[in-house]
Regions:
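Basic, Lys/Arg- and aromatic-enriched nucleic-acid-binding interface segment
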Residues: 30-41, 45, 49, 60, ...
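Short, basic (Lys/Arg/His-rich) helix/loop patches that form interaction surfaces
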Residues: 100-110, 126, 181-191, 205-251, ...
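Catalytic-site neighborhood detector that most strongly recognizes the C-terminal catalytic loop/helix
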Residues: 84, 151-152, 157-162, 246, ...
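C-terminal flanking helix
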Residues: 52-59, 268
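C-terminal secondary-structure termini that scaffold catalytic or DNA-interacting sites
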Residues: 95-102, 144-146, 182-189, 194-199, ...
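C-terminal catalytic core of Y-nucleophile DNA break-rejoin enzymes
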Residues: 79, 157-178, 188-212, 227
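Conserved tyrosine-mediated DNA breakage-rejoining catalytic core shared by Y-recombinases
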Residues: 8, 72-73, 96-98, 126, ...
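Basic/aromatic-enriched alpha-helical hairpins
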Residues: 1-35, 54-56
Length: 279
């Protein structure tokens, strides 16, 4: 709204704010620090929410007279999902992480890279949100034997949808077992994932970016950048392609069936259907 008086801001002004905000930096030759030429939908939603909060506060202070509350909202026309690794890309990332451990210049760097490797393994085979993984404790991981006689692990996960049990893919259990043995000896009551100095993981995005850069797979074929969340999406797509039911995938990931279908339904063709489609 610029220099507009707060009592003059209405729904029309707020709706016009979105295209103005989206295009504001488009013509800048040099961007200010931390500014993005093309703000994300999430940024636009946050800015809209902030503007409405300011107007609401002004109304509570009697600065808007009898003007009605702002009801305008911003909803992206199309929800975007962070890209999911293709199987060959994940394998390439895995091989690169292993090589980076072998070439680490010192003990601290080696430990950081070993942490990234097990962190990537668990998220890619469980669908955890990064925030959920960062809060896991050693005592939240419980061994069990499944109906096929395989040793596996059940996690007690606390996330934005509450507490749930989550099962990791059995293919990861041997490496996880080795890591768990190490963490139980170091700090049996501590965090499952801890930095080399013992502190909580905030984010491993810098380490992941370095590994992706070395692997030559920073972006997918559409130019979309891979992030830590891409591991969660990789899990969802692979599970659906392997024929795991939508309900089971949603429950394990702490998401709704609708979200799983909307976000991943077009990306993941189950093997049985892919076979039929290829006939």
């Amino acid at each position: 709204a610029g220099h507009m008086a707060v009592e003059d801001i209405d729904d029309k002004v707020m709706r016009e704010f979105i295209p103005w905000r989206r295009d504001y930096y488009a013509s800048f030759e040099v961007l200010p620090k931390n500014a993005k030429r093309h703000p994300t939908d999430k940024t636009l939603q946050w800015d809209m929410m902030l503007g409405k909060a300011i107007v609401k506060w002004a109304a509570s202070q009697g600065l808007r007279g009898n003007r009605p509350n702002i009801t305008a909202t911003y909803t992206p026309k199309k929800k975007r999902v962070r890209p999911a690794f293709e199987t060959w890309e994940f394998r390439q990332l895995w091989r690169t992480m292993c090589k980076r451990i072998d070439t680490a210049r010192d003990v601290r760097t080696r430990k950081s890279r070993e942490l990234l490797k097990i962190y990537v393994l668990v998220l890619a085979n469980s669908g955890f949100r990064p925030g959920e993984a960062n809060k896991l404790k050693v005592r939240d991981v419980h061994p069990f034997i499944d109906e096929k006689g395989r040793n596996n692990y059940r996690f007690v996960v606390r996330g934005k949808t509450g507490e749930r049990d989550a099962i990791i893919r059995s293919a990861a259990n041997k490496r996880l077992d080795k890591y768990l043995t190490k963490r139980r000896a170091e700090d049996p009551a501590g965090l499952l994932f801890a930095m080399p100095d013992g502190s909580k993981v905030v984010t491993l995005i810098d380490q992941l970016n370095a590994a992706l850069r070395d692997a030559g797979i920073e972006r997918n074929s559409f130019g979309e950048k891979y992030t830590i969340y891409s591991l969660r999406h990789f899990y969802a797509v692979q599970a659906l392609r392997n024929g795991v039911g939508v309900f089971e995938v949603a429950r394990n990931m702490g998401a709704s069936v609708e979200i799983i279908q909307e976000y991943y339904g077009k990306q993941a063709t189950a093997a049985v259907f892919a076979t039929r489609l290829g006939d």
